[in-house]
A protein has these predicted regions:
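Non-heme Fe(II)/2-oxoglutarate
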Residues: 1-69
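Catalytic core of non-heme Fe(II) oxygenases with the double-stranded beta-helix
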Residues: 62-167
Length: 167
């Protein structure tokens, strides 16, 4: 697992924020109940809203991340809005060359949950990272990982961009 801080320019972060602000009010969202396998929704009492990034944002994003993402021939780039109670169960992203998560919240309190936890392939010790603004986590070794449930005591979404490159 690679954890990279401050990966995007502030200009692109602002462009993403504008698109998200407009998109949140639209009807272009699906849910984890529809898109995720049941095994990924164990222990989750909430849902994640999922929507494609625009072609423009995807192009800008992938251009800025060109030197940090593994090579790929095809890639999916989606916004995820993690609602109260949402989580994702232990899994390894086995059908993907890599999976990556970009954290977009300006502020995230540890008490709100949504902690990304993984088990390095060469260790029995789990590691974890709190959602941190403009941080990218790249899983290119199919490491076991999960996200802890989002607290019902938060009034905000856990906002991420998910990037997946199929095998």
């Amino acid at each position: 697992m690679k954890v990279l801080n401050n990966v995007l320019s502030e200009d692109l972060i602002q462009e993403i924020s504008k698109e998200l602000k407009n998109k949140i009010q639209s009807d272009s969202w699906g849910t984890s109940e529809v898109f995720w396998e049941p095994s990924l929704r164990l222990n989750s009492t909430g849902t994640v809203l999922i929507s494609n990034c625009s072609d423009r944002i995807q192009k800008l994003l992938l251009s800025e991340l060109e030197n940090v993402l593994p090579e790929y021939s095809e890639v999916f780039v989606k916004y995820h809005l993690w609602q109260k109670g949402s989580a994702i169960s232990c899994h390894q992203d086995m059908n993907y060359k890599f999976g990556a998560t970009l954290y977009l919240n300006d502020v995230w309190d540890l008490n709100w949950g949504g902690i990304f936890v993984w088990k390095p392939n060469d260790s029995n010790t789990m590691k974890a990272i709190a959602p941190t603004h403009n941080t990218l986590v790249v899983n290119d070794e199919s490491e076991l990982h999960f996200v802890t449930p989002i607290s019902y005591n938060t009034d905000t979404f856990r906002v991420t961009i998910q990037i997946f490159a199929p095998i």
